[in-house]
From Swiss-Prot:
Gene3D superfamilies: 3.40.1350.10
Native organism: Albidiferax ferrireducens (strain ATCC BAA-621 / DSM 15236 / T118)
Family of the protein in this entry: Belongs to the UPF0102 family.
InterPro entries from the UniProt entry: Restrct_endonuc-II-like, tRNA_endonuc-like_dom_sf, UPF0102_YraN-like
Protein name: UPF0102 protein Rfer_3873
Length: 128
């Protein structure tokens, strides 16, 4: 008896996420930001990840979370960034900044992609 194979969307979801990140990167670069690092992760379990770390023309370090949704149901892409997710991003940002001799001014931006439309939310949340 043949066992039916179950198709997962892991590869498809990962590819869609990578494509969204690439679109966000191009959008930010066209706006004058420069890429410092991609997919920065803190070591160990329970840490955080930052999709893109950019430098704005004024010298501000910009930590960017990229979110993509096929449609705006369940609140859309921006609404999917929970307080817990924000804390993890802030944790990773602090970890990144500790490596620098003199930390620059920074902010947390979100780039959403919904139905092919890019929206850039500058200073979307703050580190308390």
């Amino acid at each position: 008896m043949a066992i039916p194979q179950i198709k997962t969307q892991v590869g498809t979801s990962k590819q869609a996420g990578d494509a969204a990140e690439e679109s966000a990167l191009r959008h930010l670069q066209q706006a004058g930001l420069r890429l410092l690092q991609r997919n920065y992760r803190t070591p160990g379990r329970g840490g955080g990840e930052i999709d893109l770390i950019m430098r704005a023309p004024d010298g501000t370090t910009v930590f960017v979370e990229v979110r993509q949704r096929a449609n705006a149901s369940h609140g859309g892409a921006a609404a999917s960034i929970s307080v817990t997710k924000q804390r993890r991003i802030i944790f990773a940002a602090r970890h990144y900044l500790m490596r620098l001799r003199e930390p620059p001014p920074c902010r947390f931006d979100v780039v959403t992609l919904e139905c092919g439309v890019i929206q850039w939310l500058q200073a979307a949340f703050e580190a308390c």
